[in-house]
A protein has these predicted regions:
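Active-site neighborhood for divalent-cation/phosphate handling
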Residues: 1-3
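ATP-binding/phosphotransfer module of carbohydrate and carboxylate kinases, centering on a glycine-rich
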Residues: 5-11, 52-56, 61-203
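Glycine-rich phosphate-binding loop of actin/hexokinase-like ATP-binding domains
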Residues: 9-69
Length: 203
């Protein structure tokens, strides 16, 4: 909603906002209105069971999309690959048992850390496959990639676009534009404030 009012939206009425931070979720706008579903929980994209990977999601289920395409998945995979002998600018921090944050990984990416870039591109590819399904179903004009990992820019955006071209129907995706959020990691916070303000004035 924040992106809809103050970000990348320029008249589009059918939009999917993908928030890729520690977790993974989406916001859906249909005909200019937020779609919340019956109970208000629409958009739990990260908990679509997509993988037979036996990785336990924080929701208590196994194989959720979030276990392969989120900030938490990125940190887990980075630590797994370092444990298998691969080298990263963050290797010393991992060996010293210092907790890693997404800011650390983004900073390493900006310094051309090959492992971090590779992992982010892999997450982009996984996301793109599943965003393809959303595009086929909802036929949005605009898909906005936001959240912490959107700060990696083209490293995550280009694999998403490539996967969408590969896995979605051309008749549908030709009307869809995919962009990085203007508001970045602040879109959710700004959107919450704007929704609260809107509801206050409605009352």
């Amino acid at each position: 909603y924040g992106e809809y009012l103050q970000g990348k939206v320029h008249g589009e009425k059918n939009i999917i906002f993908v928030n890729v931070s520690w977790g993974l979720g989406i916001g859906i706008i249909v005909d200019g209105r937020i779609y919340t579903g019956k109970s208000g929980f629409a958009g739990e994209f990260g908990h679509v069971v997509s993988y037979d990977n036996e990785v336990l999601c924080h929701c208590g289920k196994k194989g959720c999309l979030e276990t392969e395409a989120s900030g938490s998945a990125l940190i887990r995979k980075l630590m797994e690959r370092e444990a298998n002998g691969e080298i990263s600018l963050l290797s010393s921090r991992i060996r010293e048992k210092n907790a890693l944050t997404l800011k650390d990984v983004i900073a390493a990416t900006e310094k051309d850390d090959v492992m971090c870039i590779d992992l982010i591109e892999d997450i982009g590819n996984n996301l793109g496959k599943h965003i393809s399904g959303l595009i086929n179903i909802l036929n949005p004009e605009l898909v906005i990639i936001g959240g912490a990992l959107s700060l990696t820019g083209d490293y995550i955006l280009q694999p998403i676009k490539t996967a969408v071209r590969k896995y979605s129907l051309n008749l549908v995706n030709r009307d869809t534009t995919i962009v990085i959020s203007k508001l970045g990691d602040n879109a959710g916070l700004i959107g919450s404030c704007l929704i609260s303000r809107s509801r206050m004035f409605e009352e």
